[in-house]
């Protein structure tokens, strides 16, 4: 959840570290800090509560410069957001350390270190790592070995970046369950949680593998495997791309990403839907052998990706006739799962580094599944490397914490999967509709001003209720999630048919009720449910197919351009994204970086 940046260079790296943190801020923004070794081999540190800009302001007031350093932006796990708990953490003024992840046995290690005479100044598990590395350095005077030995004692999933004032020419990194990237520059080398942070500085990168440690200097990067054996890892070119971090004409990244959906869906579909055979090949070389044997499907994901899986269940069961079970990854990994014969295991993740999703995949690989399939947006992610089959969405980098374009490209991928597994001519109709999807999205985006006009009606609301039926129920769930994430309005979603089983008790004149009402086989049923809301005086907002003649009966009707039935869940998602965005803007919340959240959930 936190962002790590580090560099060893022939030049001052303070501004490089700061720019890297700006690109990692999506991973956490409770506090930030930097530590460098200056020209006199002194360890200098600046920490601040709040966002990276606060750190930049503090650095203006403090002369901090050096050729070796580490920096960090934090999402709080152990210890409240504060300067005291911010990284980097020090040990004896000699070692500085940044950390992403959780050290599960930190309490035991803390007590052990106290008996050795170490004193703690923070509430974090990270300070335990700093002191433990210092302890081992005292024994061996080898920073790499000290980090390796300390990591062997620590339980959990984490990544570390470490410097020592007596070793000003080197930076040590280790990965154990949390992603870390090594970057090669000219006269300088780097570490980072995400290659995005290195795009302006590094020419190529190594994606550290599980258990890897590395010693980074200006001249070289040496990588060691989990057995501390020097190894060669694949080096990948890194293309600079300034557009990825620019909002362009948009006020927020989230709005930019909403409006990019037509393009990224086009990119995701490109060269994949020419025919069913071509489509099946898009899921990897093994897919042609695996797909004919599939009898059941398990989908495991978190958050927005879980909602994508719920929608996929309707498509896969309807089109492919395959029993499909959808699980929340954090629940799946801790229960006994019955795996029927010939079950395909599917994981979905934007980043491919979501901790619970990865743990679920590792569990599945030890179970009796036919094969695993990853639907992911990051080609170099752990999820992609570990799965048997892969479908890469082409959403591009998503900066806004609330996922938009990553979600709709996941849905496009799932609809393609359902078509690939379909055994009758309905697959051709799905392909035809998919070809129309980008244009449908463009038409829906033209609703922006109309949806914006609704925002003032929600600004002072405390609660909201979203309703849908059938495949639109997960769409309602996603709409509720978006609203609560960025506007901080408590929002729930229910199947409309469940109104009488509890949620109707919440409905009164102050409760906005948002319904998703495409022209499908459940429309008449949904209308009956909405009459129940109107009869109780609820404030009803209904997103309806513009080809239908609705009687408002006091409801606010928002007409959505008609689209093919298979596309409706994707198309109706977009106005709900716009609604959440404009309500958040009207309330003055931080749209791209909502409180208490982070983009990439790399801790349990």
From Swiss-Prot:
Keywords, A to Z?
A: Aminotransferase, Cytoplasm, Glutamine amidotransferase, Repeat, Transferase
Q: Where does it reside?
A: Cytoplasm
Known PROSITE patterns for this protein? GATASE_TYPE_2, SIS
- Could you tell me which Pfam families the record lists for this protein? GATase_6 (PF13522), SIS (PF01380)
Q: Which GO terms describe its cellular component?
A: cytosol
GO terms for MF:
carbohydrate derivative binding; glutamine-fructose-6-phosphate transaminase (isomerizing) activity
Report the superkingdom from the record: Bacteria
Its BP terms in the Gene Ontology are: carbohydrate metabolic process; fructose 6-phosphate metabolic process; protein N-linked glycosylation; UDP-N-acetylglucosamine metabolic process
The record places domain SIS at 279-427, 454-594
- SUPFAM superfamilies associated with the record: N-terminal nucleophile aminohydrolases (Ntn hydrolases) (SSF56235), SIS domain (SSF53697)
Q: What is this enzyme's EC? A: 2.6.1.16
The record's section on Gene3D superfamilies has:
Glucose-6-phosphate isomerase like protein, domain 1, Glutamine Phosphoribosylpyrophosphate, subunit 1, domain 1
Q: Does the keyword Lipid biosynthesis apply?
A: no
All copies of domain Glutamine amidotransferase type-2, residue ranges: 2-219
Which residues are the active-site ones? 2 (nucleophile), 599 (for fru-6p isomerization activity)
Functional description taken from the UniProt entry: Catalyzes the first step in hexosamine metabolism, converting fructose-6P into glucosamine-6P using glutamine as a nitrogen source.
Q: What is this protein called?
A: Glutamine--fructose-6-phosphate aminotransferase [isomerizing]
Gene name of this polypeptide: glmS
């Amino acid at each position: 959840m936190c962002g790590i940046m580090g560099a060893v260079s022939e030049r001052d790296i303070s501004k490089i570290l700061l720019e890297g943190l700006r690109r990692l801020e999506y991973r956490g923004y409770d506090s930030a800090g930097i530590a460098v070794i200056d020209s006199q081999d002194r360890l200098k540190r600046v920490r601040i509560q709040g966002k990276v800009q606060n750190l930049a302001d503090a650095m203006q007031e403090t002369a901090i410069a050096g050729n070796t350093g580490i920096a960090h932006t934090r999402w709080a796990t152990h210890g409240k957001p504060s300067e005291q708990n911010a990284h980097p953490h020090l040990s004896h003024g000699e070692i500085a350390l940044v950390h992403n992840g959780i050290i599960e046995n930190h309490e035991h290690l803390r007590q052990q270190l106290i008996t050795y005479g170490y004193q703690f100044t923070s509430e974090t598990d990270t300070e335990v790592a700093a002191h433990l590395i210092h302890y081992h350095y005292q024994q061996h005077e080898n920073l790499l070995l000290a980090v390796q030995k300390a990591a062997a004692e620590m339980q959990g999933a984490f990544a570390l970046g470490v410097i020592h004032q007596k070793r000003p020419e080197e930076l040590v990194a280790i990965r154990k369950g949390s992603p870390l990237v090594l970057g090669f520059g000219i006269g300088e080398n780097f570490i980072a949680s995400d290659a995005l942070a290195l795009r302006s500085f590094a020419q190529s990168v190594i994606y550290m593998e599980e258990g890897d440690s590395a010693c980074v200097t200006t001249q070289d990067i040496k990588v060691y495997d989990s057995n501390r054996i020097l190894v060669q890892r694949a080096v990948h070119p890194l293309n600079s791309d300034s557009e990825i971090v620019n909002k362009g004409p948009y006020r927020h990244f989230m709005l930019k990403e909403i409006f990019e959906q037509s393009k990224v869906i086009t990119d995701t579909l490109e060269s994949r839907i020419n025919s069913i055979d071509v489509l099946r090949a898009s899921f990897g070389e093994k897919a042609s052998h695996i797909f004919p044997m599939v009898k059941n499907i398990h989908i495991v994901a978190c958050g927005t990706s879980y909602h994508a899986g719920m929608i996929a269940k309707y498509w896969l069961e309807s089109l492919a006739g395959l029993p499909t079970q959808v699980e929340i990854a954090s629940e799946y990994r801790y229960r006994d799962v019955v795996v029927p014969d010939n079950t395909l295991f599917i994981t979905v993740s934007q980043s491919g580094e979501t901790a619970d999703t990865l743990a679920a995949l590792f569990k599945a690989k030890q179970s009796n599944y036919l094969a695993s399939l990853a639907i992911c947006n990051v080609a170099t992610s752990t999820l992609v490397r570990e799965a048997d089959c892969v479908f890469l969405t082409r959403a591009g980098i998503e900066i806004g914490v609330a996922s938009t374009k990553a979600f709709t490209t996941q849905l496009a991928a799932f609809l393609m999967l359902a078509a690939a597994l379909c055994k009758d001519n309905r697959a051709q109709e799905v392909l035809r509709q998919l070809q129309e999807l980008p244009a449908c999205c463009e038409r829906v985006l033209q609703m922006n001003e109309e949806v914006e006009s609704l925002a003032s009606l929600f600004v002072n609301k405390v609660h909201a209720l979203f309703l849908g039926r059938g495949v639109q129920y997960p769409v309602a769930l996603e709409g509720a999630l978006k609203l609560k994430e960025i506007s901080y309005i408590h929002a729930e979603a229910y199947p409309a048919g469940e109104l009488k089983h509890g949620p109707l008790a919440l409905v009164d004149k102050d409760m906005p009720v948002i319904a998703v009402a495409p022209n499908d086989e459940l429309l008449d049923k949904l209308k009956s449910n909405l009459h129940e809301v109107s009869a109780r005086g609820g404030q009803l907002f209904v997103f309806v197919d513009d080809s239908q003649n609705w009687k408002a009966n006091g409801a606010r009707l928002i007409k959505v351009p008609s689209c093919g039935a298979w596309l409706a869940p994707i198309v109706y998602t977009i106005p709900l994204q716009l609604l959440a965005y404009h309500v958040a803007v009207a309330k003055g919340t931080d749209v791209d970086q909502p409180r208490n959240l982070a983009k990439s959930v790399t801790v349990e």
